[in-house]
Amino acid sequence: MISRVTEALSKVKGSMGSHERHALPGVIGDDLLRFGKLPLCLFICIILTAVTVVTTAHHTRLLTAQREQLVLERDALDIEWRNLILEENALGDHSRVERIATEKLQMQHVDPSQENIVVQK
């Protein structure tokens, strides 16, 4: 650490005597590459981790919304299925079938004495 400070001071003293102009971005880049490799790598890792966290949170929110939509759809289908079961039971009721047969189709009960049995060989 002390050697860096003395090196920097010697550069400043040397540059004060001469009227050279240094490009600030070049000096900063040179310092980063020479002395700041670890902090630069850590900074890049932090940025990548932050982007990954944001992306993961976004995907989690999308999947949660999709799950909620699927739960609502499942509930609607369950209600429809129950209504269809009730309708099937109501339409298949024997008294209803018998009433429709006698009223709309004019069907009658056959007396056992009037029954004809057909035997197929």
UniProtKB/Swiss-Prot annotation:
Motif (Leucine zipper-like): 58-85
Membrane topology: Single-pass type II membrane protein
Self-association state and partner proteins as the record states: Part of a complex composed of FtsB, FtsL and FtsQ. The complex can be formed before its localization to the division site. This tripartite complex can be divided further into a subcomplex of FtsB and FtsL, which forms in the absence of FtsQ. Also interacts with FtsI, FtsN and YmgF. Homodimer in vitro. May form multimers.
Listed transmembrane segments: 35-57
Classification via InterPro entries: Cell_div_FtsL
The organism's place on the tree of life at top rank: Bacteria
Residue ranges that the Swiss-Prot or TrEMBL entry lists as coiled coil: 63-91
Cytoplasmic side: 1-34
Recorded family membership: Belongs to the FtsL family.
A GO CC term attached to the entry: cell division site
Function: Essential cell division protein. May link together the upstream cell division proteins, which are predominantly cytoplasmic, with the downstream cell division proteins, which are predominantly periplasmic. Can also mediate Zn(2+)-sensitivity probably by increasing the permeability of the inner membrane.
Domain-level remarks: The cytoplasmic region is involved in recruitment of the downstream cell division protein FtsW. The transmembrane segment and the membrane-proximal periplasmic region form a coiled-coil structure and are required for septal localization and interaction with FtsB. The C-terminal region is required for interaction with FtsQ. Contains a leucine zipper-like (LZ) motif, which is required for optimal interaction with FtsB.
Phenotype reported upon loss of the gene: Mutants show inhibition of cell division, formation of long, nonseptate filaments, ultimate cessation of growth and lysis.
Chain ranges on the Periplasmic side, renumbered to this chain: 58-121
Protein name: Cell division protein FtsL
Keyword Cell membrane: yes
Protein's UniProt keywords contain Membrane: yes
Gene Ontology biological process terms, A to Z: cell division; division septum assembly; FtsZ-dependent cytokinesis
Primary location class: membrane
UniProt subcellular location: Cell inner membrane
Gene name of the record: ftsL
Keywords on record: Cell cycle, Cell division, Cell inner membrane, Cell membrane, Coiled coil, Membrane, Transmembrane, Transmembrane helix
Pfam families on file: FtsL
